[in-house]
Regions:
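Dinucleotide-binding Rossmann-like beta1-alpha1 core, especially the glycine-rich loop
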Residues: 1-30, 158-161
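Conserved beta-strand segments of alpha/beta enzyme cores
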Residues: 18-20, 69, 211, 238
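Flavin-dependent oxidoreductases
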Residues: 79-174, 178-189, 195-198, 204-207
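Hydrophobic/aromatic beta-strand patches that form the interior of the parallel beta-sheet core
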Residues: 71, 102, 240-242
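A short, glycine/Asx- and small/polar-enriched loop/turn
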Residues: 33-38, 80-87, 96, 222-226, ...
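C-terminal catalytic lobe of FAD-dependent flavoproteins
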Residues: 58, 158, 166-168, 179-256
Length: 256
């Protein structure tokens, strides 16, 4: 009943129309290398994956085609605010006088909000480590999978990492979630990789660290409300905040 209820919640409350509940036997028919002890699975057959950095580059190229200018190696150092409006943005390469400022600065979004006299949220950085496996491991599965226990359904705001068959036929494993005070701490630690594998082996026991070809760590930018902030400035009128996006940012980008 609990699994069925969660499935129906995703289908009708969250609006994920292709959500279906399948038996462990059907899951193993589709993915023979999954854990044979699995009793049920929630399937979304319409889901898929893209190349994240390829799509990001394509977004940037499309923006330039539509008149955007990209300023690389440019840091915002401060802002002038008068009468509820940002009148100047000071950078290490000069000063801009904007009509509108969009605060999409990730882990630095609260710093930008502070410069604009419009800070009403806080960011607490959260590291996440991914491992990429050799293509031979890509033959183990052909979908996107994660394990989610009953405790995770009620206590977390994410799927808790997973296993992804990439567009390049590798497997991507992760990420984990580790709170950090360092906004740019992209170091990768052995315990993070070990934790990710110990969890994802519940889904696919055949996973092995020997197949890792590379790994990397990113830093999410959650708020304490664990939700997106997409709204106009509350005190500064020519400001729009796009903060607290976290991991789903790539997927939600078209809607955002």
């Amino acid at each position: 009943p609990a699994v069925w209820g969660y499935c129906m919640w995703r289908k009708y409350h969250d609006g994920i129309a292709d959500t279906e509940l399948i038996s462990g036997r059907e899951l193993l028919r589709r993915e023979p290398n999954f854990n044979e002890k699995t009793r049920f699975a929630i399937s979304n057959p319409d889901s898929g994956c893209v190349c994240p950095y390829g799509l990001t580059i394509a977004y940037a190229e499309n923006a330039v085609q539509n008149g955007a200018r990209i300023a690389l190696n440019t840091a915002v150092l401060g802002m002038d605010v008068a009468d509820g409006r940002i009148t100047a943005v000071h950078t290490n390469r000069g000063t801009l006088h904007p009509a509108l400022v969009i605060n999409a600065a990730g882990v630095f979004a609260e710093d930008v909000a502070r410069m604009a006299d419009d800070r009403f949220f806080s960011i607490h950085p959260r590291r996440g480590t991914n491992s990429i496996l050799d293509r031979k491991a890509g033959a183990f599965m052909h979908s996107i999978a994660s394990v989610k226990g009953n405790d995770m359904v009620s206590k977390t705001h994410s799927k808790g990492g997973g296993i992804l068959h990439t567009v390049h036929d590798n497997l991507l494993i992760g990420p984990d979630a580790v709170e950090t005070y360092e906004k740019e701490n992209t170091a990768t630690y052995p315990e993070s990789i070990a934790h990710v594998f110990s969890k994802q082996k519940i889904t696919m026991p055949a996973l092995t660290e020997r197949d890792i070809i590379t790994y990397f760590t990113g830093v999410r930018a959650p708020t304490f409300e664990e939700d997106f902030i997409i709204e106009r400035g509350r005190h500064t009128h020519n400001l729009i905040h796009v903060a607290g996006i976290q991991s789903p940012g790539l997927t939600t980008a078209p809607a955002v």
